[in-house]
C-alpha cells in the first residue's frame, strides 16, 4: 500500500476526524501532521476538514471501549511527544482490533511511549504550579511560561480555584496560547504574539522585594547549585522573577497624559466563552 499522509488543522477535533476518515475510506496512514508542521513531500497527502460531529463519534467510540484509553488519548495529544498523532492513531487501531487489555502493559510499544510522555507532562505541570510568577498589571494578574508540553489545561483548575476572586492570565510562549480567567469563567485561546508591558512603580518595587528576599534567605556556605537545579530546573528560570536581570525591575515612565496598557485589552472581560478543542478541561 502506498504511503499516505493526512494533514489537519492542529486541533484535537481535527485529529479525531483524521481517524474517522481513515476508517471511512479503509486507509492505513503513514503519518498525520498539522498544517503548521506540514512540509512538502512526494507522498500522497490529503487535507482533512474538521467536523465536530465526526470527532465526537470517534471519541465516544474510544471512551466506550476504555475510559482509560479516552484519558490517554486526550492527554497524549497535549504532550510534546514527536509524531504523537500517528502513535495515538496506532493506539486507537489496536484498541479497536484487540480490545483494551494491552493498555495495562507498560511495556507495550503501542502505548509505552505515550504513557511516558504523559508522565513527563504531568511532572512539568506539577512543577509549574509552584514556578508560575504573577505580576499585578493594572489590576490583572499576569504571568508567562515556556513549557515543553501544552500544560494550560492541566493548570486550569488549580489556578482558577486558587485565584477564584481574581482576574488573571497565563500566557504560554511555546504554544502561543493563553489561559484567561475572570468572574468565575475561564478559557484557553490562541494568542500568536504577546509581550507583557513594563510594570508600574509599585509592581516594580514588589518584584525587587521578592528577588531580594530570595537572595537574602540563601545561606552562602550551604549553596548547592546541582541540588537547586534538580529541584528547580534551569529551563524554568527564564520566566521566574527571582532570576530576572535589572530591566525586569525598572518601572515604565508615563509620557504626558498617555495611559500605559499594563494588560492587553480584553483579558479582564467577565464573559469569556469556553474554548473548544484540545485545551478543554482535562
How should each PLM-predicted stretch be described?
Residues 1-52:
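N-terminal ordered "arm"
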Residues 14-25, 89-97, 157-161, 208-215:
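Short, hydrophobic/amphipathic alpha-helical patches that form generic packing surfaces
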Residues 30-41, 169-177, 191-192:
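A generic structural motif
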Residues 33-126:
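Charged, alpha-helical interface segments at or near domain boundaries
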Residues 49-54, 185-198:
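Acidic, Ser/Thr-rich peripheral helices and adjacent loops at domain boundaries
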Residues 101-190:
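Internal, well-folded beta-alpha domain core
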Residues 167, 178-179, 198-278:
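Long, compositionally biased intrinsically disordered terminal regions
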Amino acid at each position: 500500500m502506498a504511503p499516505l499522509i493526512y494533514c489537519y488543522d492542529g486541533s484535537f477535533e481535527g485529529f479525531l476526524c483524521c481517524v474517522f476518515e481513515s476508517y471511512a475510506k479503509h486507509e492505513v496512514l503513514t503519518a498525520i501532521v498539522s498544517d503548521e508542521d506540514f512540509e512538502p513531500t512526494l507522498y500522497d497527502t490529503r487535507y482533512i476538514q474538521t467536523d465536530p460531529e465526526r470527532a465526537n463519534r470517534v471519541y465516544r467510540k474510544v471512551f466506550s471501549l476504555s475510559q482509560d484509553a479516552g484519558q490517554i488519548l486526550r492527554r497524549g495529544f497535549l504532550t510534546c511527544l514527536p509524531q504523537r498523532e500517528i502513535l495515538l492513531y496506532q493506539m486507537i487501531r489496536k484498541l479497536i482490533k484487540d480490545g483494551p487489555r494491552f493498555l495495562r502493559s507498560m511495556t507495550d510499544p503501542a502505548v509505552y511511549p505515550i504513557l511516558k510522555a504523559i508522565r513527563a507532562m504531568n511532572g512539568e505541570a506539577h512543577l509549574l504550579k509552584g514556578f508560575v510568577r504573577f505580576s499585578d498589571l493594572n489590576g490583572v494578574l499576569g504571568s508567562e511560561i515556556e513549557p515543553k508540553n501544552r500544560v494550560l489545561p492541566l493548570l486550569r483548575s488549580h489556578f482558577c480555584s486558587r485565584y477564584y476572586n481574581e482576574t488573571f492570565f497565563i500566557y504560554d510562549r511555546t504554544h502561543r496560547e493563553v489561559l484567561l480567567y475572570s468572574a468565575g469563567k475561564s478559557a484557553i485561546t490562541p494568542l500568536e504574539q504577546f509581550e507583557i508591558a513594563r510594570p508600574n512603580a509599585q509592581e516594580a518595587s514588589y518584584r525587587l522585594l521578592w528577588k531580594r528576599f530570595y537572595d537574602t534567605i540563601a545561606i552562602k556556605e550551604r549553596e548547592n547549585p546541582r541540588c537547586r537545579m534538580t529541584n528547580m530546573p534551569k529551563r524554568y528560570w527564564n520566566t521566574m522573577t527571582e532570576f530576572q536581570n535589572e530591566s525586569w525591575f525598572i518601572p515604565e515612565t508615563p509620557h504626558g497624559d498617555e495611559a500605559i496598557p499594563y494588560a492587553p485589552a480584553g483579558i479582564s472581560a467577565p464573559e469569556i466563552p469556553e474554548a473548544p478543542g484540545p485545551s478543554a478541561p482535562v
